[in-house]
Structure formats: C-alpha cells, structure tokens
Amino acid sequence: MDQTRDISLEGWNIVRADEADWVPWTGSAGEARAKILGTADGSMVTLVEAQPGYAGSPHEHAHSEFNYVVEGTLRSQGQQMSAGDGYAAAAGSTHSDFETEAGATYIVIFKI
C-alpha cells in the first residue's frame, strides 16, 4: 500500500540532488559551484563545493543565514570550522571573512 498518495506537497519544494544542476557560485577569489536544493518564501537551501583558495565577498546579511560544513575546512569571521561545524548569522550582521584554503563542501540556508 502506498501511504504517500494522500500526502499534500502544496507549499513544498523538494529537489533531488542528482537532478539539480551545478551553477557558478561567486566570491572574491577562487572557484565554487552550487546546487539549489530547495526554495520557499524567498529562502533557499544550497549545497556549495568551494575549491581550495575560494573566498566569499564581504556582505551584510539582510536576513539570517545558516551554514553547515559537510566536508573540508573553512574560516568564517576568523573562526576555523571543519566537517560537522556550523554557524547562524543574524540579520544585520556583517560577513567580512569567509575563506577555504584546502576546499570545503557546505550547506548554506539564506533568504535573498
């Protein structure tokens, strides 16, 4: 018996990672690519693969931002982070330091 047939997906955006396209992910240095894994109400869940030497561009967060490191290491706001680490940045906070020397894969959730 298929118990999922009566479950509504209204308001849901479920994306299969193997069906999502990689798109360029911009920064101030190095290369990265991303897969958009879901969007809702202006927010998105994004899987990012950053190559060694990638650095994000400084910016202010208009909305909160959440990050989870899946693999590798990165530095955010002067703090070293590795697989399993994460951060939450409040709306209005300034992101002035984001870099990976060795490369990293991470999930970032934010609103545009």
Give each language-model segment a name.
Residues 27-33, 38-60, 80, 90-94, ...:
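Conserved short histidine dyad/triad with adjacent acidic residue
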Residues 48, 67, 87:
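Conserved GNAT-family N-acetyltransferase fold
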Residues 52, 62-76:
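Glycine- and acidic-residue-biased ligand/ion/polar-headgroup-sensing regions
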Residues 1-42:
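A short, N-terminal "cap"/entry segment at the start of jelly-roll beta-barrel domains
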Residues 96-100:
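Short, Lys/Arg- and Gly-enriched loop/turn segments at beta-strand edges
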Residues 88, 101-112:
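A short hydrophobic beta-strand segment most commonly corresponding to one strand
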